Amino acid sequence: MKRMMIVAALAALTTTTVAQAADPAAYVEYRKSVLSATSNYMKAIGITLKEDLAVPNQTADHAKAIASIMETLPAAFPEGTAGIAKTEAKAAIWKDFEAFKVASKKSQDAALELASAAETGDKAAIGAKLQALGGTCKACHKEFKAD
């Protein structure tokens, strides 16, 4: 048992050290990538609705992927990554990080609601939840993303 605790402690220390040693520009590249993926998932959902595509479960799966990204998104904005590389992230993120986390959580919740609507197959409900998710994205961008 003692040995297991030592191994777990060393693993945690190693993980923390690696995270702290990461290149700040890599965080910028990472968050651009996941936010681009989020945008593409939303576009795919919109196309599926507009064109009435027969792609079973994809809308719910895409919405769940967005929710997963939003759940962990704040971790992609650690201290020391403001103004690194070419980024559209406003300093407001780090000035009021709690508000940024709340905005991310709102998007996560909206994405989960979209996933639930998608599982019913009700296109009107899916469309409404997609618009609601888009609204949370827009609100976050207004506050935290430079044009």
UniProtKB/Swiss-Prot annotation:
Modification after translation is described as: Binds 1 heme c group covalently per subunit.
Any one GO molecular-function label of the UniProt entry: electron transfer activity
Cite the Pfam families for this sequence.
Answer: Cytochrom_C_2
Q: Where does heme c bind?
A: R31, T87, E88, C137, C140, H141
Signal sequence region: 1-21
Which Gene Ontology CC terms are recorded?
Answer: periplasmic space
The record's Gene Ontology biological-process terms are: electron transport chain
Q: According to its UniProt entry, what is the function of this protein?
A: Cytochrome c' is the most widely occurring bacterial c-type cytochrome. Cytochromes c' are high-spin proteins and the heme has no sixth ligand. Their exact function is not known.
Name of the protein described by the UniProt record:
Cytochrome c'
Q: Which organism is it from?
A: Rhodospirillum rubrum (strain ATCC 11170 / ATH 1.1.1 / DSM 467 / LMG 4362 / NCIMB 8255 / S1)
Q: What is the lineage of its organism?
A: Bacteria, Pseudomonadati, Pseudomonadota, Alphaproteobacteria, Rhodospirillales
